[in-house]
Design a protein with these regions (language model features):
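Catalytic cores of carbohydrate-active enzymes across secretory and cytosolic contexts
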Residues: 1-545
Length: 545
C-alpha cells in the first residue's frame, strides 16, 4: 500500500464514519459529521487520516412490515469485494496485535483513499483465530454489552494508535471525535516510555499534549459510565507492559466511583471542543475546568448541495424549476421505497433524523384533528414526510417509530408517509426535495444538529425549535421558529397562516416571497459548511496556542 504523501497529519478517530450508504459504519449524526469532515479534508488537500471500525452491519437496514412494525435486517455489504482495500505492507497483509487479559488479538485493516493527502482506515477483529466475542464485536456499532463496548473502544483507540505507529506516520495531533477512542493514551504512553525512555508522568503529559477532544452531546445516554473493575480488567495488560498499577492508567476517568469515558477524554486532552455556541455554554457549565472552544459543526456542501444552487446568477424561474425537479425526484424515491405516492406540487414538510424521545417526533401530532384540517385544505394542501431509524440501545425509539407509522397509516393516511431506512442516499433527496425542514427537539438537548444545514444549502426552509446551531441564525424572513413549550400550537398556526399561504402565493406561476426566503437560506449555508469548520479546527483546536 502506498501511503498518502502527508506530513504531520491529523489522526481523526471516530466510532462512526458515514462515507457511503451501503457501508455499515454509521448510524446517525456522529458518523455523518465524521464523513463530512474527512471528505472536506480530502477536498482541501488537508493532511488527515481517519481511523474507524469496520462493522458488519447486523440489524443495520430498517424494514417496515405490512402491519407497520419495524424490523432490522442485516447489511449485505461485503468488505472483501467492495471499494475498500485490504491494507498491506510490502505486499503482505498488515496484522496488528492487541494485548488482552486472555492473550493477543489479531486486527486486520482495510482502507479507503479519498485524496493524495487523506485516507480512512477501518479496523476489524473478524478473524478466524480470534475468540468469538471479539468477532461478534464487529456485528454492529452500539449493540453489545459493556465489555463489548470497551473492547470496541480498545480496538479503536489502542489499535488505531498501533496502526499509525506501524505505518511510520508521525501525527501532528490525535483528534478524538467523541470519547470512545480515549484509550489511545494507553498506547501513546507505552510508546513514549519505551521509545523515548520517559517516566510515566512525563509520557502521560506528552500524550495529553498531542490529544484534542470533541464532545457531541451532554445527554447521559451519549456519555457512558462503566464499573472501575470492568475497565481495570481490560487495562491490566497495558499497565503490565510498563510496570504500573492499573489505577494509574484509569485515574483520569474516576467519576463517583465509576469510570466515565467522557470525563476520561476531557482529562487526557489538552483542548476540548463543543459543536455549537450554545453547546459550548452548557459544556462550560457542566465541565468548567477545561479548555473549551465552541466550533459549530458544518456540512460538506459538495456532498449535500446541488451544484446549481452555487450559481450566484441563477434567476428566480431557474431556481424554482430546479427545486421542482428535486421535489419530483424525492417523490419518485418515496414511491420506490414505500409504494405510496403524492402530488409533488403540494407543500412538502419533512421531519427526518434518528428517532429519539428528546427529538420529539410526535410533537406536531398533538392535535390530529386540527392537523388534518390544515393539511387537507384544498387550496393549500400539505404533504408530511417522516424518516428515521431507531437506536439499538434505545428500545423506546422502536416504539416511537411504530406509533408514528400507525398514526400515518390510519388518521393521516392521505397526508403523511413514513419512509424506511433513512441513510445518506435518502437524506440527499429529502434535504433537496422538501419545501420545509421541520426540527422539534426539547430545548437545550440538541448539541448541534446538521440536517437543517443541508436543507438550507438547497433552499429548503427551516421551521425549528431554537437549539444547537439554529441559535446562530436570525430566522426573520428566512424560516420560522417554534417555542419549545408550545411546539404543536406554534406549528399549526405558522403552517396555516404563514407557511402554506406564502408557498401558494404565486405571481406568473412563481412563489416570489417563498423564493426570496430560499435565496436567503442558500446564502446562510456557507457559514455552516465543513470548510468553515475545518478552518476553525485548524485555528482553535489543532494549533498549539
Amino acid at each position: 500500500m502506498r501511503l498518502p504523501e502527508v506530513k504531520d497529519p491529523v489522526v481523526y478517530f471516530s466510532n462512526e464514519f458515514a462515507l457511503d450508504s451501503e457501508l455499515p459504519t454509521y448510524v446517525g449524526g456522529l458518523g455523518i459529521l465524521a464523513g463530512d469532515f474527512i471528505n472536506e479534508a480530502a477536498f482541501e488537500h488537508f493532511p488527515a487520516i481517519g481511523v474507524g471500525i469496520l462493522y458488519k452491519g447486523k440489524n443495520y437496514i430498517q424494514h417496515i412490515t405490512g402491519d407497520g412494525k419495524e424490523e432490522k435486517r442485516d447489511s449485505e455489504f461485503d468488505h472483501d469485494t467492495s471499494f475498500l482495500r485490504l491494507t498491506t505492507i510490502n505486499g503482505k497483509e498488515l496484522i496488528i496485535k492487541l494485548p488482552t487479559p486472555t492473550g493477543e488479538i489479531s486486527v486486520k485493516v482495510y482502507h479507503l483513499r479519498l485524496s493524495d493527502t487523506t485516507i480512512v482506515f477501518f479496523l476489524s477483529t473478524d478473524i478466524d483465530t480470534n475468540p468469538d466475542e471479539w468477532r461478534h464485536d464487529m456485528d454492529t456499532i452500539y449493540g453489545g454489552d459493556n465489555d463489548s463496548q470497551i473492547r470496541q473502544q480498545i480496538l479503536l483507540g489502542v489499535g488505531g494508535t498501533k496502526l499509525i505507529k506501524e505505518l511510520g506516520i508521525n501525527p501532528k495531533v490525535y483528534h478524538l471525535n467523541e470519547g470512545r477512542a480515549a484509550f489511545c493514551i494507553w498506547e501513546l504512553v507505552i510508546l513514549y516510555m519505551k521509545d523515548g525512555a520517559m517516566k510515566f508522568d512525563e509520557a502521560w503529559q506528552k500524550a495529553k499534549e498531542n490529544i484534542v477532544y470533541t464532545n457531541h452531546t451532554l445527554v447521559d445516554a451519549g456519555n457512558p459510565n462503566y464499573t472501575i473493575d470492568t475497565v481495570k480488567y481490560w487495562a491490566k495488560p497495558y499497565a503490565d507492559q510498563i510496570g504500573i498499577d492499573c489505577g494509574m492508567l484509569l485515574r483520569d476517568g474516576d467519576f463517583f466511583n465509576d469510570f466515565s469515558i467522557t470525563k476520561y477524554a476531557l482529562n487526557i486532552s489538552r483542548k476540548q471542543s463543543a459543536v455549537s455556541r450554545v453547546h459550548g455554554d452548557y459544556a462550560r457549565k457542566k465541565y468548567p475546568d477545561y479548555n473549551w472552544v465552541a466550533i459549530t459543526n458544518g456540512v460538506f456542501l459538495r456532498r449535500w448541495q446541488d451544484s446549481d444552487f452555487r450559481n450566484d446568477t441563477i434567476t428566480d424561474e431557474e431556481l424554482w424549476n430546479i427545486h421542482r425537479l428535486k421535489k419530483h425526484e424525492l417523490m419518485e424515491t418515496v414511491i420506490k421505497r414505500t409504494g405510496f405516492g403524492y402530488d409533488d406540487n403540494k407543500l412538502v414538510i419533512t421531519w427526518a433524523r434518528r428517532l429519539a424521545d428528546y427529538k420529539q417526533p410526535k410533537a406536531i401530532l398533538k392535535d390530529i384533528d386540527r392537523l388534518i384540517e390544515i393539511v387537507s385544505n384544498s387550496s393549500h394542501p400539505v404533504q408530511i414526510l417522516y424518516a428515521g431509524n431507531s437506536h439499538a440501545a434505545d428500545m423506546g425509539s422502536k416504539a416511537l417509530i411504530e406509533e408514528v407509522i400507525h398514526i400515518f397509516s390510519t388518521k393521516l393516511s392521505s397526508h403523511a408517509i413514513f419512509i424506511p431506512n433513512y441513510n445518506i442516499a435518502l437524506a440527499n433527496h429529502l434535504t433537496s426535495g422538501s419545501d420545509v425542514w421541520l426540527n422539534t427537539p426539547k430545548g437545550n438537548l440538541e448539541a448541534c444538529g446538521t440536517s437543517g444545514m443541508k436543507a438550507i444549502s438547497n433552499g429548503v426552509l427551516n421551521c425549528t425549535v431554537l437549539d444547537g446551531w439554529t441559535y446562530e441564525v436570525d430566522w426573520e424572513g428566512v424560516g420560522w421558529t417554534l417555542n419549545p413549550e408550545s411546539v404543536a400550537d406554534d406549528f399549526y398556526s405558522l403552517l396555516e397562516n404563514e407557511m402554506a399561504p406564502c408557498y401558494y402565493d404565486r405571481t406568473n406561476g412563481l412563489p416570489l416571497k417563498w423564493i426570496k426566503r430560499m435565496r436567503k437560506s442558500i446564502e446562510i449555508a456557507e457559514g455552516f459548511s465543513a470548510k468553515r469548520m475545518l478552518e476553525e479546527y485548524k485555528k482553535y483546536l489543532y494549533s498549539q496556542n
